[in-house]
Regions:
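Short, acidic/turn-prone active-site loops that include or flank metal/cofactor-
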Residues: 8-10, 102, 122-126, 150-151
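Divalent metal-binding pocket/active-site signature
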Residues: 10-19, 23-114, 134, 139, ...
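Flexible, gly/pro- and Lys/Arg-enriched active-site loops
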Residues: 124-127, 145, 153, 165, ...
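Short glycine/serine- and small hydrophobic-enriched flexible loop segments
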Residues: 173-174
Length: 174
């Protein structure tokens, strides 16, 4: 009952090349690989350059389309670019999860209309998570996926400690 997602996180795209994409695609043929991810854009850090991240994001969306696998999307401080690129690439046809969703209701509505699930984790318990709590109240329950992002983003009362699935009850209670 163990399955995998195969993809390159945006923070690792500076080292990505076509040979690695071919290797990822060959891995996606394995019956235990069920998604392409975690792929997307991360503008929190200055590197890798946004243009490099965008290039490989599109390339991995194309890989998901060709392998007929859903996607797991990473988007940090890149709401507009991520959404625009996903629309342009018709990512709604693939479906998947917006991992660690952290934007507001308007962006959530766009993703939900595309058929994506929203990943909700420990951040929803933070005092400054008002927008995310509004999203959780707005979104249909069947469109939410509980996540840990282990070992990161532990919920209150364990914020700053190592996260694990043992903390999911705090996310549910939020």
């Amino acid at each position: 009952w163990m399955y995998a997602a195969q993809g390159i996180h945006p923070s690792e795209t500076a080292e990505l090349d076509e040979e690695k994409i071919r290797w990822i695609e060959s891995c996606c043929a394995h019956e235990k690989v069920k998604a392409v991810g975690e792929i997307g854009l991360d503008y929190y850090w200055e590197e890798p350059d946004h243009s490099i991240q965008k290039k490989w994001f599109v390339r991995q969306l194309d890989l998901a389309r060709r392998t007929k696998l859903p996607v797991i999307i990473h988007s940090r401080d890149a709401a507009k670019d991520t959404l625009d690129m996903m629309k342009a690439e018709k990512a709604g046809d693939m479906g998947g999860v917006i991992h660690c969703f952290s934007y507001g209701k308007e962006i959530a509505r766009e993703y939900l209309n595309m058929g994506f699930f929203l990943g909700i984790g420990g951040v929803v318990t933070f005092n400054n998570a008002k927008k995310l709590k509004e999203v959780v109240e707005y979104a249909p329950l069947k469109s939410l996926v509980l996540e840990t992002d282990c070992p990161y983003l532990a919920p209150v009362p364990n914020r700053g400690k190592r996260n694990s699935s043992l903390n999911l009850t705090y996310v549910v209670d939020a």
